[in-house]
Design a protein with these regions (language model features):
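Short alpha-helical segments that sit at the start of domains
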Residues: 1-21
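Short capping segments at the starts of secondary-structure elements
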Residues: 18, 29-36
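Hydrophobic residues on short alpha-helical segments
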Residues: 21-27
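A short acidic, leucine-rich amphipathic alpha-helix
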Residues: 36-40, 55
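Key DNA-contact positions within bacterial/archaeal DNA-binding proteins
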Residues: 46
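Residues within the DNA-recognition helix of helix-turn-helix
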Residues: 51
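Beta-hairpin "wing" of winged helix-turn-helix
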Residues: 58-72
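Conserved segment of winged-helix/HTH DNA-binding domains
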Residues: 69-97
């Protein structure tokens, strides 16, 4: 599959931070609530949210809001999407030719 330069850049940026790699690993085990991820990483929810947004933009994760029984607040859960990262010379040729 030929990727655009923009897609390649988003993927590269998403994988360029150790916290985001750790988030991918954590989400490979099960879907998680953002506060649970923040607590386990010992980071603020805001910082984890920024990392997850970058992973979501690159197509690695997806999220949804849910209302839990006995709790009227919406909770944002994240899960890993199936992915296979490859950068082929053919992609580069198509982008720059």
């Amino acid at each position: 599959m030929t990727q655009s330069l923009e897609q390649i850049v988003y993927i590269g940026m998403a994988l360029a931070h150790p916290v985001r790699i750790q988030l991918l690993y954590m989400l490979s085990e099960k879907e998680r609530y953002i506060y649970e991820l923040a607590k386990d990483l010992n980071l603020s929810r805001q910082v984890v949210d920024l990392h997850l947004k970058r992973l979501e933009k690159a197509g690695f994760v997806e999220s949804d809001l849910r209302l839990e029984e006995n709790d009227m607040r919406a909770k944002k859960f994240f899960r890993l999407k199936e992915f296979d990262v490859k950068l082929c010379t053919e992609d580069l040729k198509n982008i720059f030719s």
